[in-house]
Amino acid sequence: MFLAQEIIRKKRNGLALSTEEIQFFVKGITTNAVSEGQIAALGMAVYFNDMNMDERIALTTAMRDSGTVLNWQSLGLNGPVIDKHSTGGVGDVISLMLGPMAAACGGYVPMISGRGLGHTGGTLDKFDAIPGYQTEPSSELFRKVVKDVGVAIIGQTGDLVPADKRFYSIRDNTATVESISLITASILSKKLACSLDALAMDVKVGSGAFMPTYEASEELARSIAAVANGAGTKTTALLTDMNQVLASCAGNAVEVKEAIDFLTGAYRNPRLYAVTMGLCAEMLLLGGLASDEADARAKLNRVLDNGRAAEIFGKMVSGLGGPVDFVENYSKYLPQSQIIRPVFADTQGYAYSMDTRELGLAVVTLGGGRRKPGDALDYSVGLTQVCALGDKIDASTPIAVIHAQSEEAFAQAEEAVKKAIHIDEVAPEKTPEIYAYIRASDL
């Protein structure tokens, strides 16, 4: 029998907790046997004294097991269960293409996603822009769509990882969100509760990233790769660039449109293509669906070019309650804002740098993101045709197009966009879309 306060004392004093102590405490979080004050105290003790890798694995698996752990065996799936998770960014619409692409190559993708908060967009908010799409279906419907279509992108259900829900809300209010150990356990407990065979992790780097520096992003990526592999899920973490908007747009309906244009081949932003292919190829390799990277990329290009990935996206949308002709007629269904107008820079030259976080916050100001959980969204607003770093900018070249509902909102966003995109006389050095892969063999 353990005492919560003794576990807190041990961690406060910088000692390692045993697996049994961690399991006891996490069970107490779930059953309310541990108080809010005790959870906050442990969070702060971990923040200052950290956890070793064994502790991180124990915390992650205990939180995973605090609620329902999905079981796919009864469905008789004839391929691996694979997934991707991103630490979040601006214009990060990858999941919408990657899920159907991986499914078209023989994987099963039960993707449990989140809503946006702060400057980052949420995958679920994009799907909420599609009329009828159920982001919170019954578990029966979720399983049916995964089996029949190969991919279902939905929100976290109430019985999945309840310990994380309670722990996270307390961390959010007690300044302990930024602990690498606690971030690792929070992210992975949700993903591992889906009983994945393999996971590709997208850790963003740069001005629009969650972590403030490259070093912090790399530390998080290494922690996630080590803990996930240690918990028995084949995982690779990629460090990818978020020093500019990833897609050509940022918002909800506008990103859904870009995802469909990508899947159908109408338009593929080269940076978005590079990161999507890197992550998706890694999923196929880890899941045993490709012999090497060249094979994985060839398979992915094939399902893009023959329309199979776009077809699967359409089947997922209709399977979860959306329109059956959504891919073909998306413009009929997606909401449009009242004002759609370009914004121009005050100087000429090259797009030199971008405060990506500020561009994300401009979307929030327009009404396309949340200042606090529970805020209602306007799915029609956002930015499109956002310039890329290195683009030549003159008086006739917009740096972005703003989708707004009022002149006042447009003016606010225009000022924010102009401030966030820095124009210089010289072009910046080109940076890679993917900085590094952290595989199990690198740990």
From Swiss-Prot:
Repeat among keywords: no
Keyword terms, alphabetized: Glycosyltransferase, Transferase
GO MF annotations, alphabetized: 1,4-alpha-oligoglucan phosphorylase activity; thymidine phosphorylase activity
Entry annotated with the keyword Disulfide bond: no
Domain of life: Bacteria
InterPro entries reported in the protein's UniProt record: Glycosyl_Trfase_fam3, Glycosyl_Trfase_fam3_N_dom, Glycosyl_Trfase_fam3_N_dom_sf, Nuc_phospho_transferase, PYNP-like_C_sf, PYNP_C, Pyrmidine_PPas_bac/euk, Pyrmidine_PPase_CS
GO biological process terms, semicolon-separated: pyrimidine nucleobase metabolic process; thymidine metabolic process
EC number: 2.4.2.4
PANTHER family linked: THYMIDINE PHOSPHORYLASE
Family to which this protein belongs: Belongs to the thymidine/pyrimidine-nucleoside phosphorylase family.
Cited function: The enzymes which catalyze the reversible phosphorolysis of pyrimidine nucleosides are involved in the degradation of these compounds and in their utilization as carbon and energy sources, or in the rescue of pyrimidine bases for nucleotide synthesis.
The protein's name: Thymidine phosphorylase
Organism, scientific name: Shewanella sp. (strain ANA-3)
